[in-house]
Each structure stands twice: as structure tokens, then as C-alpha cells.
């Protein structure tokens, strides 16, 4: 039976945190089929060993993509090239290896909303941001509305990737030659082109800010990738306000 939801976990040198991430995924209480797709971008720590251990106890179908060379540093769109082709679910949830979900009902809550409302392209929710070295935390964003539109996501990150669940039929629109540094903003905007995003006030995940991770070593060349994003967005949606978006980016 095909899964209803494909959970994507991308990781790089996150052995210290990966167990918390995978445990939170495995703890989801659902009455539908789920698959887990793990992409490791050539970690040099014990991340791959931890993945091997969890494969043995995964309660649902699991697919692994274990790179021999780091793809992110080459600017390769790992989602379109490696991950999305393996997706079988109607919906996609993402949780990076150093983040984790805190509510076992998270997927059920979000999928129920999407199944009942075809006009929504995605759902998101509140998150907690934890600063590992500073021993402090805060809410990701004090958002006070449920219906999120393109203008809402154009200038600000109002929810975190670990809170996001979107329809997989949007995948063909997400292919981009060079993966942007701010891939989440690109993803949120494309989803907002094709329907509103429903936002839950419930706090159901943790975004861990640490020096370890996929974006821990950002160079000027990596930042330059985002210059390709506005043109791609304009290709997808001819009504996309290119110059207004660039004004937001230049202020950021």
C-alpha cells in the first residue's frame, strides 16, 4: 500500500542529535501509511552508523540515501535530484537531523486539515528555537493568524521547516538548477502560489540552533545561490512581484 505521507530527514554530521530526531518521528501516532526517506550528505562522524541502527527498528518503510561526497557544497539540489524521486506519499513532511517533533499527534493534526481542505497547499505550526551553547530558547514567531498567503511568507520566515507539511503534487515546480541557501523560503513561496497555508498555533517541534549542521559553514558562493531564486519564482508564477521580493531580500 502506498504511503499517505513521506517524511524527509536530511542530515550531515548530526550524530549528537539524530536519535532525538528519529525517535520523535517514530513516536508519531497515525492511522495511515508513512514512509521515511533519510538523506545523509557524506557525514564524517557516526551519523551513518546511527542510521543503520534505526533502520532495524523503524515502524514503517524506510529509504536511505547515503552520499559518498558532500552534495550541498557543490550546489546540487539534493531534493530534486535524490530525494523527491523517491517520494510516494500524497503529502511531505520535513525534519532535519538536528531538529525534532514534540507532539506525537503532529502529523495526524496536519494531515487531517489538508485532507479536509483541498484549497490549502500546506500546513505549518509554532516551533521552539533552542540555542544549544547559550542555554536559552524562544518561540519561532508570534504569528496571530491562521490563513497564510504569499505576501505573508515573502519577507519573513514565519514558521520553521520542521513544522511544514505540503502536498507532493507541488514537487514538479520545485526543481531549481542551483539549490538556494534559503531553500525553505523558496519552498514556502512556491506552495503559497497554489493555495493558502494553514497555520496552527500549537507548538509541536524544536528548531535547534547549533554550530553543527548542514548550513554551519556558509560561504559567499553559497549565499550567491539565492540570486537565482527570484527568476525561478517568476518563471513558476508570472504574477510573482519580483521587485517587491528583491526589496525584502536586500533589507534582510
Task: Report residues per predicted region.
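A conserved acidic beta->alpha catalytic loop
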Residues: 40-49, 69, 96
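Glycine-rich, basic loop-to-helix element that forms the pyrophosphate-binding segment
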Residues: 67-88, 109
Amino acid at each position: 500500500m502506498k504511503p499517505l505521507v513521506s517524511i524527509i530527514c536530511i542530515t550531515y554530521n548530526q550524530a549528537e542529535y539524530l536519535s532525538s530526531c528519529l525517535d520523535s518521528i517514530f513516536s508519531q501516532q497515525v492511522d495511515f501509511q508513512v514512509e521515511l526517506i533519510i538523506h545523509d550528505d557524506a557525514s564524517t562522524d557516526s551519523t551513518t552508523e546511527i542510521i543503520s541502527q534505526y533502520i532495524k527498528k523503524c515502524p514503517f518503510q524506510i529509504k536511505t540515501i547515503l552520499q559518498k561526497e558532500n552534495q550541498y557544497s557543490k550546489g546540487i539540489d539534493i531534493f530534486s535530484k535524490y530525494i523527491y524521486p523517491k517520494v510516494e506519499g500524497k503529502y511531505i513532511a520535513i525534519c532535519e537531523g538536528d531538529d525534532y517533533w514534540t507532539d506525537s499527534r503532529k502529523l495526524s493534526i496536519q494531515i487531517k486539515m489538508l485532507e479536509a481542505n483541498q484549497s490549502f497547499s500546506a500546513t505549518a505550526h509554532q516551533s521552539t528555537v533552542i540555542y544549544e551553547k547559550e542555554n536559552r530558547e524562544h518561540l519561532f514567531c508570534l504569528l496571530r493568524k491562521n490563513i497564510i498567503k504569499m505576501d505573508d511568507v515573502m519577507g519573513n520566515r514565519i514558521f520553521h521547516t520542521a513544522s511544514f507539511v505540503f502536498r507532493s503534487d507541488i514537487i514538479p515546480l520545485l526543481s531549481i538548477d542551483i539549490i538556494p541557501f534559503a531553500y525553505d523560503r523558496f519552498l514556502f513561496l512556491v506552495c503559497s502560489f497554489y493555495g493558502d497555508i494553514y497555520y496552527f498555533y500549537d507548538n509541536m517541534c524544536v528548531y535547534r540552533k547549533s554550530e553543527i549542521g548542514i548550513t554551519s559553514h556558509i560561504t559567499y558562493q553559497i549565499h550567491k545561490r539565492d540570486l537565482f531564486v527570484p527568476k525561478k519564482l517568476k518563471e513558476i508564477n508570472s504574477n510573482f512581484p519580483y521587485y517587491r521580493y528583491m526589496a525584502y531580500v536586500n533589507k534582510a
